């Protein structure tokens, strides 16, 4: 009996230890059903917990006392945010940066287009992919205005409100509208892109919308937009430098003009969060920690061209590889905002939860840096070869990418 017991097949418990009270394995199909059921239950529980946590977070930030802070900021927005907008008469327009037949005449317009196409021919495919991704992101402006107009106590209720908050949303949107327009015109004139595929991607992205944590909360919303405006300024600025290095000064001027706008918009939203930290530090720093725990998702994360199921991941890999927008940029933005908002110095008015949120945010850049170093070391050890990924935007030509 002893020998028989020692040679019996032992079943394995869910923690991986042998169960000596059972000498027969359960049927494979039963085991598979158990694990699938357990995994589904765990995912459902996790989702319910996340939804409950977000509901509590939104409820806290939409309390009357919190919204009153935003309402009392109206005169401050009038004095410190609205002046960052440029009137239409002073702002650059797309016709200033791409050939304009009305200004050049038929012959001049034709010559300018030939010159544009000649310069565009020298831009590598990888940089074109990044440019299209940036343009698609800009063209989804209807989604972003809709999201901004969900922020309680800081929205345009009628669509033509005279409040400072409402005028800012409309003015910001008017300036942003030129970005996608000018990039779209350049791409059309360059002749290097499958514009129907680009346009389908824009169409699908606007139709898909975007997901944002705690979307009705102005605290979370302004933090998100401050981060994103800096990210787009960096992306367009890096694109300008990259294409200038390949001889396209006209495209560099376009990207530089867009980056300059984004920096003004970043300044506006950064000021708003700065003011919120002064007026309500506990709620604001907790909102900042909440957003960073869930990471700042990119606004075009749902982009889809109808062919590549992993289009955004491939675009992000191209941007990382080309130096257009990298993981280090993400960390750098966080470090900049922590310094600008003096998060480490926050003390007065913080609850215990607020202090924990402050400490979490201040420690996060170093954690991200360590993750970057580990990822770099793993990549060096694996010595992976690049994968050729076709992009429909450039007529399905492949771009060699280092994928995770």
From Swiss-Prot:
Its cofactor is Fe(2+). It is found in: Plastid, Chloroplast. GO terms for cellular component: chloroplast. Its main location: plastid. Fe cation 1 binds at residues 138, 176, 179, 262. Its EC number is 1.14.19.-. Keywords: Chloroplast, Fatty acid biosynthesis, Fatty acid metabolism, Iron, Lipid biosynthesis, Lipid metabolism, Metal-binding, Oxidoreductase, Plastid, Transit peptide. It holds the Pfam family FA_desaturase_2. Gene3D superfamilies: Ribonucleotide Reductase, subunit A. Binds 2 Fe(2+) ions per subunit. It is an enzyme of class 1 (oxidoreductase). Residues 1-39 form a transit peptide. One of its GO terms (biological process) is fatty acid biosynthetic process. InterPro entries: Fatty_acid_desaturase-2 (IPR005067), Ferritin-like_SF (IPR009078), RNR-like (IPR012348). GO terms for molecular function: metal ion binding; stearoyl-[ACP] desaturase activity. CDD domains: Acyl_ACP_Desat (cd01050). Disulfide bonds: none annotated. Introduces a cis double bond in the acyl chain of an acyl-[acyl-carrier protein]. Belongs to the fatty acid desaturase type 2 family. Homodimer. This is Acyl-[acyl-carrier-protein] desaturase 7, chloroplastic. It comes from Oryza sativa subsp. japonica.
